[in-house]
Amino acid sequence: MTRREDGRLDDELRPLVITRGFTEHPAGSVLIEFGHTKVMCTASVTEGVPRWRKGSGLGWLTAEYAMLPSATHTRSDRESVKGRLSGRTQEISRLIGRSLRACIDLAALGENTIAVDCDVLQADGGTRTAAITGAFVALADAVTYLSAAGKLSDPRPLSCAIAAVSVGVVDGRIRVDLPYEEDARAEVDMNVVATDTGTLVEVQGTGEGATFPRSTLDKLLDAALAACDKLFAAQREALKLPYPGVLPEGPPPPKVFGS
């Protein structure tokens, strides 16, 4: 089989590195690297929930996505300087939030909020899928932090793992984890978010200048789910290590009558 320009097989992921505890202050902080794409994902815990959720007893999870000005070959102005977020930034932020909310029992958080921030340090395609995959690991660490602080009503609020990958048709062949060079000329481009229980959270697919048959869609999904299985294995391996920071001390146990 002819290999891709970067030497990979069609079903092969780029070299993947997940570094926990990348920064000190958030409850969860991860640097995830898919080849040359590098995204910092943090999960911060704050007391309280949005106004529309107050009094419900439920927690909330929100997400923001951004790219550093020099994340690509050509520097771009910060969106904060422009005074408004682009449609792309808003779309990806919402995608990350939806994806992570699919795996967590918000009732277990009480009225606390987990804010997930995904900042692209270097972009070479697949930034949104890398952000989701890394953000799940940061979220898992934030849950560990909340559990240690005694703030969870359920000690295991995560029902599954979440990962995402890009797939596409390039040069007539189905390929996974597209770098920018392949993404820019793909005949079909798709992002797939999945759970480690085999279900789908979201599928975003587009024919770039051409249509594609149902059979191609099925093959793309098969390739994406197989790639996600590898991502789940990498997440599990990363999370085997102890929590990378200092955990808070939970509230003291209630006194027993007569003690």
From Swiss-Prot:
Gene Ontology molecular function, alphabetical: 3'-5'-RNA exonuclease activity; tRNA binding; tRNA nucleotidyltransferase activity
Reaction(s) catalysed by this chain, per the record, are: tRNA(n+1) + phosphate = tRNA(n) + a ribonucleoside 5'-diphosphate
Q: What is its EC number?
A: 2.7.7.56
Q: Where are the transmembrane segments?
A: none
The positions annotated for binding phosphate are: 88, 126-128
Among PROSITE patterns, the record links this protein to: RIBONUCLEASE_PH
Question: The organism sits in which domain of life?
Answer: Bacteria
Keywords on record: Nucleotidyltransferase, RNA-binding, rRNA processing, Transferase, tRNA processing, tRNA-binding
Q: Which residues does UniProt assign to the signal peptide?
A: none
Enzyme category, top tier: transferase
The Gene Ontology biological process terms listed for this entry are:
rRNA catabolic process; rRNA processing; tRNA processing
What's this protein's family per the entry? Belongs to the RNase PH family.
Instruction: Write out the function statement from the record.
Output: Phosphorolytic 3'-5' exoribonuclease that plays an important role in tRNA 3'-end maturation. Removes nucleotide residues following the 3'-CCA terminus of tRNAs; can also add nucleotides to the ends of RNA molecules by using nucleoside diphosphates as substrates, but this may not be physiologically important. Probably plays a role in initiation of 16S rRNA degradation (leading to ribosome degradation) during starvation.
The record's subunit annotation is: Homohexameric ring arranged as a trimer of dimers.
**The protein's name:** Ribonuclease PH
Species of provenance:
Mycobacterium avium (strain 104)
